[in-house]
């Protein structure tokens, strides 16, 4: 590509240093704000602008450098003669932006190389700005090395280099045809700094100063050296995007952010090689066409549209330009590699993705921008479709080996043979239950000859594991036997087998079933396959029940007292008003709190005292106590802290003792004491020794329960002794 004449100078601007982001470059590249302030201002034109820090390749000058709150910002000028050296290596059709419907557009424009381009193409200056923005997108400042005792002077700034990626973060270069076009790209730059830079640029322009022509041989050498040094640079676009964000550059006009270097919609080279196609992202053209709309005129996006954040996707020019036979040649999606009997039905199950539309011929493609959010939705949809295929592959797997072993061990029936397969929960699915089950309905429409397989809800009947997958065939079954269609199903019909259920009209199914009687073909076609599973009676499974112990007398008395107390409390609450009920509830809460505190205090006291006889785990007495305690808690609704039955017995025993002492004292005062007869020795009868009582010493709470039971027994023995003396 050759430029007829030298272009006018263009402007460049950007941050040379961002004060808050200097850690990544290293300490030797750190520039403190106070040091920079002593080196300013800079005389316009004194600091040169070169390529890759090559002093012999000067291409412009620095107009002004200002110190703002965010960092050190500069505005410079680049010589228009640099375009002559760069355009020598640019293809002629790189910047073509023809209108496909215009006389100069489309395929005809490829043969008109000597004629003038249409009026809607980019100007030479805009092409030059695109080249600079994409070939030299960054800035790098060269300054004097800071040392102890060094004071910045007029020669502190050596030069500003245009490069691929600078050492410092946020040093992005923005090019423009005028100073406002450069400065407006930085949203974080304050108005005062913009006015100062614009005034300096106006003074530079009014002075009619122009940059000297560049050395084309030196420029070519520098650009080749730059290419060789940066050929292995990884993630260049990510670095530039991060630096634009750090520099508050929101909408760069000439910075090409896409992964293709071509701006043309009718470029044959870009459509075949450099164009970013849908297949590179795992999507097809139909997925992109669902969100993008081809312009009616087929014209490529303008320079302003290229500045938006998005992803280029190759689309058809328009449906009217594809031709009548293109849509008829739509290829069906390839079936997933299913295994077993599921492979035949997988090809007829509708895919989650839309039909695949073939790519249009070369020269009839165009690039559009797709919003990142919509593109992410496409990626998620493709991932969900892949997960659905993986799920269907998992469902097509045979039942696990351990399931067959469990079935054979529990029932004595080999599930691999053509006998009855066991159902879940220890029973067989009856024919009457299966035939009266309603079909499982799905929200997706049932297309003709294409049915949806869905997961059936878990119930009490049905096969207890996933068996062989269900497939649908036409013609004959897998073993060559003629297939038939069952019409005796009620309603719409449904298939419920092996944990799967099919919704839809009467449909031809062929499936290898484990649950058929002996002699029935292994492969068959029926609408309600589980209806054949009702020949065997249900298998009863008996689970061991825990041993029940009758509650003791104390437990029944305490439960009766608690029930009477609750009934009395409910009657009082019904008789009282709402306010009195509220007060009673509060008093009850206080009483429960006080009782729990006393219970906790008693537990602490019980922890200090040892039980009378230890309890060894495994004895029957402890299980009886635990069972009685659980029954008492279930009957009362809450744990009883201190029963009142033992207190009544102790009080009654003390009363009888006092009465006996009073009688003895009265008899001693009123009558003389009689001589006591000598006791006659009676033969002692040895009573059978009782087994020592045991208590549960596993916790303080159990110790407390044992202590209470011992107190009750002592009180009962004392009461019996008193009653016997009377």
Swiss-Prot record:
Biased composition (Polar residues): 402-418
A GO cellular-component term linked to this record: host cell nucleus
Protein name: Capsid scaffolding protein
Region (Interaction with pAP): 365-384
Compositionally biased tracts (Pro residues): 352-361
Signal peptide residue numbers: none
Pfam families, alphabetized: Peptidase_S21 (PF00716)
Family: Belongs to the herpesviridae capsid scaffolding protein family.
Compositionally biased region (Basic and acidic residues): 702-720
Keywords: Host cytoplasm, Host nucleus, Hydrolase, Phosphoprotein, Protease, Serine protease, Viral capsid assembly, Viral release from host cell
Domain topic, free-text comment: Region of interaction between pPR and pAP is called Amino conserved domain (ACD). The region of interaction with major capsid protein is called carboxyl conserved domain (CCD).
Enzyme class, first EC level, given as a word: hydrolase
Gene3D superfamilies reported in the protein's UniProt record: Herpesvirus/Caudovirus protease domain (3.20.16.10)
UniProt source species: Psittacid herpesvirus 1 (isolate Amazon parrot/-/97-0001/1997) (PsHV-1)
Record-listed E.C. numbers: 3.4.21.97
Record region (Interaction with major capsid protein): 706-726
Residue ranges of coiled coil: none
MF-aspect GO terms: identical protein binding; serine-type endopeptidase activity
Region of interest (Disordered), ranges: 321-362, 385-427, 472-492, 568-644, 668-726
Catalytic residues identified in the record: 53 (charge relay system), 140 (charge relay system), 159 (charge relay system)
An example Gene Ontology biological process: viral release from host cell
Site (Cleavage): 257-258, 697-698
Family annotation (HAMAP family): HSV_SCAF
